[in-house]
């Protein structure tokens, strides 16, 4: 299996994003653009500035309650996620809970043909294997691209997360 790298970009200025992204893509195959670090009103400008490079980008608009920096309302975030999908990035990272609770968003993104990276984070612990397997099973229903991030406090925690790769033969897993 060939591994690919993805560098994360947290540029706050939409006019500087293109040059930062260009540099990042000389060092890595892909780049994650953390659009949640920008003001909501500047995200459309940022997307226009990097439109030609989005085929190599994972776009993320993470809300504060999921560890992100997005400063707008959830309604505004959903609207911006739809806009991002229209630009057809390589992947659009959307949280499991957001997708599970918003069928209209799922349908909209599906129509745009932008692949979804369904993500889930636990910033306090690594759940037990039964719960991790259940989470993976439920996430796989929403996308072939799944990202699970937890806090590992022991080698056992790390082993549980890494063992998910054995259960992910038909999906692309990031853990």
Q: Can you say where each PLM-predicted feature lies in the sequence?
A:
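Active-site mouth loops of central-metabolism enzymes
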Residues: 2-17, 63-75, 119-130
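Short, well-ordered coil/turn segments that N-cap beta-strands
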Residues: 2-5, 27-29, 53-57, 88-90, ...
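Catalytic beta/alpha-barrel core
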Residues: 8-10, 30-39, 60, 87-101, ...
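Structured C-terminal cap/extension of enzyme domains
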Residues: 19-22, 26-30, 159-163, 167-170
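Acidic (Asp/Glu)-rich catalytic clusters
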Residues: 21-26, 42-57, 82-87, 103-113, ...
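Active-site-adjacent beta->alpha loops and helix N-cap segments on the catalytic face
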Residues: 37-52, 96-111, 127-130, 153-166
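Glycine/small-residue-rich loop that forms an oxyanion/phosphate-binding "nest" at active or ligand-binding sites
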Residues: 51, 57-102
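Histidine/lysine/aspartate-rich catalytic loop segments that bind and position anionic ligands
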Residues: 109-143
């Amino acid at each position: 299996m060939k591994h690919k790298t993805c560098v994360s970009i947290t540029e706050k200025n939409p006019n500087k994003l293109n040059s930062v992204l260009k540099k990042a893509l000389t060092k890595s195959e892909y780049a994650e653009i953390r659009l949640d670090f920008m003001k909501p009103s500047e995200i459309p400008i940022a997307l226009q500035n990097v439109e030609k490079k989005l085929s190599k980008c994972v776009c993320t608009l993470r809300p504060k309650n999921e560890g992100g920096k997005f400063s707008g309302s959830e309604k505004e975030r959903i609207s911006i996620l739809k806009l991002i999908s229209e630009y057809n990035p390589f992947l659009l990272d959307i949280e499991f809970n957001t997708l599970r609770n918003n069928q209209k968003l799922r349908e909209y993104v599906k129509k745009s043909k932008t692949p979804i990276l369904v993500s889930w984070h636990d910033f306090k612990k690594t759940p037990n294997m039964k719960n991790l397997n259940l989470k993976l099973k439920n996430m796989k229903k929403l996308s072939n691209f799944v990202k699970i991030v937890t806090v590992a406090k022991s080698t056992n925690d790390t082993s549980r997360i890494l063992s998910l790769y054995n259960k992910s033969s038909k999906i692309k897993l990031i853990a």
